[in-house]
């Protein structure tokens, strides 16, 4: 591979070889040219990186980078240095793939007579499986986002954190701990706590593997800290899309019962649909708990439920369990068919919370439907 450097710069057709007059003439004639940085020779650069400490570079191993392209536009290397200087940038914090560019950038600052900022080259975020840095393709293949927002290309859409339902604070918290910690086992930080605790000197040199499940765990932690009213407001549009609308207090109650099991608000419907619509099918495995004597027991349960006036979860549970104990009925013979009748499967939050939310009439209707169906 050809490398333009001190070994060949004076052996090529360049302004270092031809005269100034010839150079000016060829430029005036419209001949295309580039402007390169003339890297000094025989020098060892001892540079400081906040994360990696002292790093050394031999200038004889560096090439002469293009600063202005043939169309007159500056390259990134030049534009970056000028921008950072004009903006009075104090710290340049970037990925370690830019470490090889550090000597050129420092030499450019020196050539301009400007004070160079401090540099910190962060470790890369690595693939969750295998070796190499995380890429868009990894997210597409394994089903997790790598972009803040949905990214559309002719080949398709790569999902974004916002559209997936991640809280910004959760993503920041997760990313901050990839290659850094505060010296303790603490994992959950508010933004203010992160600002106070974060120190580049504690960033590791080695890359950290991206763990999609840990990412979801962080989002779960932030989700359960949200107020029920906030989550209910976020869930309401999803519910409306499904064709259902309920009173605010009911939705707040539902959210309070399911949020401990959710990672995202988008999961709420799958976890709570039975609060709003009666089951039309019954889980095949769970249906095996429906025995020949079950219909009779469920009819008796209906009579018990009909007689309850204080229809709160705690009171309903007390009365139903007292009836079970008094009649010496195995609790599994009632509770599993009861849940199957209301939910269609053996899942969901506390059974008597479900009963309270859907109400007496709906509870009885669902038991009757299960008796007729199963």
Q: Can you name each region flagged by the protein language model?
A:
Residues 313-374:
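Charged substrate- and nucleic-acid-binding regions of tRNA-handling and nucleotidyl-transfer enzymes
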Residues 114, 179-184, 224-228, 266, ...:
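Short helix-capping/linker segments at secondary-structure and domain boundaries
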Residues 182-237, 247, 252, 256:
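Active-site-proximal acidic segments at structured loop/helix or strand boundaries
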Residues 228-327:
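Small-residue-rich helix-loop
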Residues 69, 87-98, 126-173, 178-183, ...:
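Conserved phosphate-binding loops in nucleotide/dinucleotide-binding enzymes
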Residues 1-141, 145, 157, 182:
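Active-site cores that bind ATP or allylic diphosphates and position pyrophosphate for catalysis
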